């Protein structure tokens, strides 16, 4: 896939794979990269390092995903690539992880991708 000139959104861009993806898209010639994460300060650090734009977003909240898509579209005048990367892990095991944590894992690791697809597709 040709990345040069593309407008890209990366969720989970505050650290790890998301940060690496933001850098990779930038290095491959993306025209603009939005770095989205619930941890705004670290997303801003990533964005600053690549001349991108940071947006705070809890991807487990459908309204925040819609806002992310709108703000990204406004800043970049469109979105060519939406990299839905954000994810979280549970505790040590099934019994040690609270029901509330499982709900959060479900929202972020599963539903966030549904919310993103609904928000970004025409």
Predicted regions and their residues:
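Canonical Rossmann dinucleotide-binding motif of NAD(H)/NADP(H)-dependent dehydrogenases/reductases
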Residues: 3-32
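Conserved glycine-rich Rossmann-like NAD(P)H-binding loop of the short-chain dehydrogenase/reductase
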Residues: 30-43
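The beta1-alpha1 cofactor-binding region of Rossmann-like NAD(H)/NADP(H)-dependent oxidoreductases
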Residues: 40-41, 57-67, 99
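Conserved catalytic-site loops of classical short-chain dehydrogenases/reductases
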Residues: 80-81, 103
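Conserved NAD(P)H cofactor-binding loop of Rossmann-fold oxidoreductase domains
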Residues: 85-90
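Substrate-binding pocket helix/loop in short-chain dehydrogenase/reductase
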Residues: 93-94, 101-106
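A short, exposed helix-loop element centered on a Lys and neighboring polar residues
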Residues: 117-118
């Amino acid at each position: 896939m040709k990345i040069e000139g593309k407008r890209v959104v990366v969720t989970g861009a505050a650290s790890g794979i998301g940060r690496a993806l933001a850098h990779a898209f930038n290095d491959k010639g993306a025209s603009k990269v939005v770095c989205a994460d619930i941890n705004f300060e670290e997303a801003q650090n990533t964005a600053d390092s690549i001349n991108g734009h940071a947006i705070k977003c809890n991807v487990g909240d459908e309204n925040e995903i819609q806002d992310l898509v709108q703000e990204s579209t406004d800043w970049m005048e469109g979105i060519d690539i939406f990299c839905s990367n954000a994810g979280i892990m549970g505790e040590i095991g099934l019994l040690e992880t609270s029901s509330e944590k499982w709900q959060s894992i479900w929202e972020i690791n599963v539903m966030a991708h549904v919310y993103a697809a609904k928000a970004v597709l025409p």
